[in-house]
UniProtKB/Swiss-Prot annotation:
Assembly and oligomerization: Part of the 30S ribosomal subunit. Contacts proteins S5 and S12.
Native species: Geobacillus thermodenitrificans (strain NG80-2)
CC per GO annotation: ribonucleoprotein complex; ribosome
Protein name: Small ribosomal subunit protein uS8
Known role: One of the primary rRNA binding proteins, it binds directly to 16S rRNA central domain where it helps coordinate assembly of the platform of the 30S subunit.
Signal peptide start-end: none
Gene: rpsH
Length: 132
């Protein structure tokens, strides 16, 4: 089966595993998915991410994070720019998610960045997703 939007597939897998409170999930790896997962880890939305070599494209194993009373850390995940409708923003238009409580993930000329990093570097790009 041909997958038209692998990033949306990854975000949906994270959202679904989070809803049923799974400890971990696996997604087919790619460079952009790996960078998105590293941002989620750095921003504290997931516990850990590891790359598993399987002599094909590899697998990303993502360990989800929950609060002390088993409450979800990720309350929302939304794909913004899709293959059929790309969404680009200029440096001064970089969006804020929930007034700074969430993050926007952007693909820029300087790599995959959060909205805060893009504002600091003064760069715009394609808005991949919102996470809150």
């Amino acid at each position: 089966m041909v997958m038209t939007d692998p990033i949306a597939d990854m975000l949906t897998r994270i959202r679904n595993a989070n809803m049923v409170r799974h400890e971990k999930l696996e997604v087919p790896a790619s460079k952009i998915k790996r960078e998105i997962a590293e941002i989620l880890k750095r921003e504290g939305f997931i516990r850990d991410v590891e790359y598993i070599e399987d002599n094909k494209q590899g697998i990303l194993r993502i360990f989800l994070k929950y609060g002390p009373n088993n409450e979800r850390v990720i309350t929302g995940l939304k794909r913004i720019s899709k293959p059929g409708l790309r969404v680009y923003v200029k440096a001064h238009e970089v969006p804020r998610v929930l007034n700074g409580l969430g993050i926007a993930i952007l693909s820029t000329s300087q790599g995959i960045l959060t909205d805060k990093e893009a504002r600091q570097k003064g760069t715009g790009g394609e808005v991949i997703a919102y996470v809150w």
